[in-house]
Amino acid sequence: MVSPSSPESNDDDDLTNADSAITPATSTITTDSPTKSSFDDYQSLSSIRIPITRRITPSLSPQYEESNISTTTSATTTTTQQQHQQQQLQQQQQQLRQMSSLSASKIEQAKTDVLNNKKISFIHRFITNWLIMDPNLISHYNNTNTRRFKNYQIENQGQSNFIYFLGGRLHTIKTKYPINLITLSLIIIPGILYIIFELSWQWRNFSPIIVIIFLYIWIISIFHFFKLSTCDAGKLPKNIHLPKKLITITTTTTTTNDNEIDHRNNYKVMGSPPDEYFNTVTLPYWKTNNDNNDNTKISKLANAYHSHGVQVKYCGTCHIWRPSRTSHCNTCQQCILNHDHHCIFLNNCIGQRNYKFFLWFLLYIVIACLYLLIISILQLCHYKFASHKESEIITTFNQSIKTHPISLLLLIYSCLAICYPGLLLAFHIFLTSQNITTREYLNFVYKKPSKSTDGGDGTRGFVNVYNTHSIWENLYINWLGKSNGVSLTFPRDYYHQGDIRFANIEPLGTFTNK
């Protein structure tokens, strides 16, 4: 009798035989060595082998399959990254070739466009456009909502030597070595040391009025320093006297981000100006009558030098006829009224509008140093005049120095600091007593007379026509009586389009050729 389970067992045997028949074929496909494959590219073999393995051998190890897939995927990813890097490299090389083909002006224009497209916050504009303003960076603010600029913002069309503060109210000169900051520190540090270490002792042992007087002199000296360092010394407007027929005007039109059209005029002086632009015009200061004058020293001087009066010259850099006693400062690149000198310790010119403050500044500095010197000596020697209790604590000068070391430091500082301001004050007292400027004294009085300036009797050709022949009157004019005047450049007024006073024009041709 046949068992019921016989057909089932036969079926199992058939399945087993079928599996054994398929397995070698599968093994042949999955165990082929890549080096012995008929394919030339192993990467192509791997990409074809994966679907065949999945279809024929579902019983393969999952770990083997995952490793095989990850190897293929990583190879594909590496190839894609390399292609992407090559594309980026090609794009960069193409951009470099395009940039090299551009001229310098186009590159600068591209940089300006990038800056204009950049949105600037209100705080950034407030700090860099009002609190501290450099006219050379005005292109950074072309995308502001308001198109009205101040004169100080457009000065020289981005080639200004000044930095403005508080909306054009104050200014200073851009310099590589800010010596004025060192000067300010030399004024502030001694006062701070005095306040910290000596003020309370002198308030108790001397008198409060002594402390108050020193603090007043110290504070007013700092005020005069800021006044001198940041005020207008008497700048004159530029480009007032230009030969119109020699001016070439070109208009550049640009469109801003606010869809507004900005017109900017470019000026250039072509050719050589007339000869009168390079002559020195002398205005006579004295009229003499040879028949009525005796052969005195004054009459000889007047007759010999009556033509050497007030000289008026043309400034080829500022393009203006300079008034009398006006000179061009190479540091400020401005013509200054009644120009005395350019002070590197204040980083500003000394002229008509701040010369009086300069004189009082020197006086206050000398008084402050002298006052500090005296009270420091009194504090160090106070033990000799003190009460019995204090004299028992401090009995010698060495003990006093150990007790008050800052007083000794301030004493030494005062002795050193009073030297230069004291000599400078004495020199300017002499100049103001003659009503003459430093520039006139060094150029015409101090230097040796030449044949062109010597009248034959050993006297110099320069005659100070501004001298009132009264020392007290000259001192009063310079220290108290002279008016500071008003600013002639109006930096805080609104800028009007096409105002040639604030344009950047090259010096006249004859000046550049010589």
UniProtKB/Swiss-Prot annotation:
GO terms for cellular component: endoplasmic reticulum; endoplasmic reticulum membrane; Golgi apparatus. Pfam families: DHHC. GO terms for molecular function: protein-cysteine S-palmitoyltransferase activity. Autopalmitoylated. Keywords: Acyltransferase, Endoplasmic reticulum, Lipoprotein, Membrane, Palmitate, Transferase, Transmembrane, Transmembrane helix. Residues 1-94 are annotated as: Disordered. Its EC number is 2.3.1.225. The active site is at C343 (s-palmitoyl cysteine intermediate). The keyword Lipoprotein applies. Residues 19-37, 44-60, 70-94 have a biased composition (Low complexity). Residues 313-363 form the DHHC domain. Its main location: endoplasmic reticulum. InterPro entries: Palmitoyltrfase_DHHC, PFA4/ZDH16/20/ERF2-like. The keyword Ligase does not apply. It is found in: Endoplasmic reticulum membrane. GO terms for biological process: protein targeting to membrane. The DHHC domain is required for palmitoyltransferase activity. Interacts with ERF4. Belongs to the DHHC palmitoyltransferase family. ERF2/ZDHHC9 subfamily. PANTHER family: PALMITOYLTRANSFERASE APP, ZINC FINGER DHHC DOMAIN CONTAINING PROTEIN. The ERF2-ERF4 complex is a palmitoyltransferase specific for Ras proteins. This is Palmitoyltransferase ERF2. The lineage of its organism: Eukaryota, Fungi, Dikarya, Ascomycota, Saccharomycotina. The gene is ERF2.
